[in-house]
């Protein structure tokens, strides 16, 4: 049983006790029955009125709760629709009081969310409007009466963040451009003369409208100032170049140049004006010394002609170069020509430098070719032969590669400019081919001259006998060394010893290596001793005919056999080659005209 029911039973019991007590009092007093009935009616009426009032109050409470539930349900439905959230789900089997409490709590929560969203929307709108005012952007139409959704608030926050980033980037760009504009104006000595320039330079940075149009105008203004500054710098640099050229042409001494050095840097207006005054002064001085100036220009013209590989016809095409009528008009013609040539060289500088590199490599190649045909190169003592051979091999690889690179670059240039690139009056590759052909013809001519010379020499030897050929003078011997040499060389004849023939002249044996007799140990001892004999010095010189990998260079003699301790007897390569050639020619001649006298010296 509920406690309320127990209390109700107790109330009934209490009422019964009270009525019983009243009847007892009335009985003791002696109140008649009619008055007792009246008094009981009064008690009943009081109790009934009290209970009726209590019931009415409770009924009113129930009505209020039901009304509140209805109101909360309607408001909650509206709030869910505005906030775009799911409708509130009421719990089943709940009392009116609990339902009203739940609905009222949910309504308060929804109201709070609505208020927060509208407050955030208002704050974001204010921030956006402020940023749009700074960026000079039109306002964004947003219904401030409606409740924004969470997604709308998220997009709004992102939009405001984007505007803030745009503002910061434009502000930074504006500050940087402003600094550059101020520097350019100071360099140009230019004061702001328009309202926009004054807004940029003089007004507060925060008051400047950071619109795209203003930023574009700023960039345009900066470009104009930079272009003007570049023009001033180029003009000043041109004036300085002109001054230096005039100094050199007029041979102005250093003590006169020093006062002008102060204006040789910078591009401000006062410096530019000072440079113009100096140029005017030098031009006037140039007209007073026109002949010397023209001669100086002609020297420069000749240098540019050489650098541009002008042919003789191209040089002669500039007729004023050969005129001796030194007038102002002639000077102007020379000035115009030197400017044209300088520009022409600057435009094609890379190609001309490449051709110059090829020319230098070609001259070096011809020098190596000349040295290769010189027999005296084998007598060097500094190891230059090996170094030259390495450089020559390297040059033989790099020269064709350089020609191919230049050919590709020149072909590309000719396609771009629709004209031929000429060197000394002809196309570069034709020029290269001509140089190679001239080199081949020169080698052929030298070969024919050698053959003719050898033929004449052979005929002379057939008639008069051979003459000794000594490619290099043997160094003198000291008395001490000559004594030792006599003890060895006189005991046995060396293969290279010369013998006087019967008919006059000298006849040489074939150079070869011969081991000494087993009993002649003194030969090996003298050749391989620690002391440097002239013969040993010649042996060391002949070792330079060998390459690092053991191969024989041109003119070398591969047939020698090394003795003990690498001591060998070699003849000079050019002497042996001439000897073998003469011997082979003599063997084919008539027997009567090729008698070779020989005398054997017994050891």
Curated annotation (Swiss-Prot):
Q: How is it modified after translation?
A: Phosphorylation by CDK1 in early mitosis holds PRC1 in an inactive monomeric state, during the metaphase to anaphase transition, PRC1 is dephosphorylated, promoting interaction with KIF4A, which then translocates PRC1 along mitotic spindles to the plus ends of antiparallel interdigitating microtubules. Dephosphorylation also promotes MT-bundling activity by allowing dimerization. Phosphorylation by CDK1 prevents PLK1-binding: upon degradation of CDK1 at anaphase and dephosphorylation, it is then phosphorylated by PLK1, leading to cytokinesis.
Modified sites of kind Phosphoserine: 510, 568
> Which stretches are annotated as coiled coil?
34-65, 96-136, 211-246, 272-304, 383-463
Q: Taxonomically, which superkingdom?
A: Eukaryota
| Cleavable signal peptide | none
Where does the record place Basic and acidic residues bias?
447-459
**Region ranges (Dimerization):** 1-341
Q: What does this protein do?
A: Key regulator of cytokinesis that cross-links antiparrallel microtubules at an average distance of 35 nM. Essential for controlling the spatiotemporal formation of the midzone and successful cytokinesis. Required for KIF14 localization to the central spindle and midbody. Required to recruit PLK1 to the spindle. Stimulates PLK1 phosphorylation of RACGAP1 to allow recruitment of ECT2 to the central spindle. Acts as an oncogene for promoting bladder cancer cells proliferation, apoptosis inhibition and carcinogenic progression.
Q: How does it assemble?
A: Homodimer. Interacts with the C-terminal Rho-GAP domain and the basic region of RACGAP1. The interaction with RACGAP1 inhibits its GAP activity towards CDC42 in vitro, which may be required for maintaining normal spindle morphology. Interacts (via N-terminus) with the C-terminus of CENPE (via C-terminus); the interaction occurs during late mitosis. Interacts (via N-terminus) with KIF4A (via C-terminus); the interaction is required for the progression of mitosis. Interacts (via N-terminus) with KIF23 (via C-terminus); the interaction occurs during late mitosis. Interacts with KIF14 and KIF20A.
Put simply, this protein is called: Protein regulator of cytokinesis 1
What organism is listed for this UniProt entry?
A: Mus musculus (Mouse)
Task: Identify the gene encoding this protein.
Answer: Prc1
């Amino acid at each position: 049983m509920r406690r309320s029911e127990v209390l109700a039973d107790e109330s009934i019991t209490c009422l019964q006790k009270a009525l019983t007590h009243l009847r007892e009092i009335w009985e003791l007093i002696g109140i008649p029955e009619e008055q007792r009935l009246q008094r009981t009616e009064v008690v009943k009426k009081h109790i009934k009125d009290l209970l009726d009032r209590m019931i009415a109050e409770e009924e009113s409470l129930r009505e209020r709760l039901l009304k509140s539930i209805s109101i909360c349900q309607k408001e909650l439905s509206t709030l869910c629709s505005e906030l775009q959230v799911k409708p509130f789900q009421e719990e089943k089997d709940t009392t009116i009081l609990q339902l009203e409490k739940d609905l009222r709590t949910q309504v308060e929560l929804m109201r709070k969310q609505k208020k927060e969203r509208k407050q955030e929307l208002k704050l974001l709108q204010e921030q956006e409007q402020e940023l749009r005012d700074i960026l000079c952007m039109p306002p964004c139409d947003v219904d401030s009466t409606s409740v924004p959704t969470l997604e709308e608030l998220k997009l709004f926050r992102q939009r405001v963040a984007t505007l803030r980033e745009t503002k910061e980037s434009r502000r930074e760009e504006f500050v940087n451009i402003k600094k550059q504009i101020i520097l350019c104006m100071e360099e140009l000595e230019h004061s702001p003369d328009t309202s926009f320039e004054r807004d940029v330079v003089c007004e507060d940075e925060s008051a400047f409208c950071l619109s795209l149009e203003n930023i574009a105008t700023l960039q345009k203004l900066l470009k104009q100032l930079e272009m003007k500054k570049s023009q001033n710098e180029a003009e000043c640099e041109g004036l300085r170049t002109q001054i230096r050229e005039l100094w050199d042409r007029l041979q102005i001494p250093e003590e006169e140049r020093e006062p002008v050095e102060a204006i040789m840097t910078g591009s401000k207006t006062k410096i530019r004006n000072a440079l113009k005054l100096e140029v005017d002064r030098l031009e006037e001085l140039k007209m007073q010394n026109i002949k010397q100036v023209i001669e100086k220009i002609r020297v420069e013209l000749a240098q540019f002609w050489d650098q541009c590989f002008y042919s003789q016809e191209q040089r002669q095409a500039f007729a004023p170069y050969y005129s001796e009528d030194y007038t102002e008009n002639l000077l102007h013609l020379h000035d115009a020509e030197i400017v044209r040539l300088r520009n022409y060289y600057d435009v094609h500088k890379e190609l001309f430098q490449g051709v110059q590199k090829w020319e230098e490599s070609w001259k070096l190649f011809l020098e190596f070719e000349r040295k290769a045909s010189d027999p005296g190169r084998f007598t060097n003592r500094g190891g230059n032969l090996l170094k030259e051979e390495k450089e020559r091999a390297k040059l033989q690889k790099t020269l064709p590669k350089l020609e191919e690179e230049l050919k590709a670059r020149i072909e590309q240039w000719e396609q771009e400019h629709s004209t031929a690139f000429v060197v000394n009056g002809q196309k570069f590759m034709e020029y290269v081919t001509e140089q190679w052909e001239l080199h081949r013809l020169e080698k052929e001519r030298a070969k024919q001259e050698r053959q003719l010379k050898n033929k004449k020499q052979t005929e002379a030897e057939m008639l008069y006998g051979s003459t000794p050929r000594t490619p290099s003078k043997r160094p003198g011997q000291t008395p001490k060394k000559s004594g030792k040499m006599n003890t060895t060389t006189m005991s046995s004849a060396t293969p290279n010893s010369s013998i006087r023939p019967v008919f006059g002249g000298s006849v040489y044996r074939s150079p070869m290596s011969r081991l000494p007799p087993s009993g002649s140990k003194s030969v090996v001892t003298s050749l391989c001793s620690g002391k440097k004999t002239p013969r040993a010095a010649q042996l060391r010189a002949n070792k330079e005919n060998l390459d690092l990998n053991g191969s024989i260079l041109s003119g070398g003699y591969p047939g020698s056999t090394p003795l003990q301790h690498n001591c060998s007897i070699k003849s000079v390569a050019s002497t042996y080659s001439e000897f073998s050639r003469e011997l082979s020619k003599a063997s084919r001649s008539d027997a009567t005209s090729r008698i070779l006298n020989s005398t054997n010296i017994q050891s």
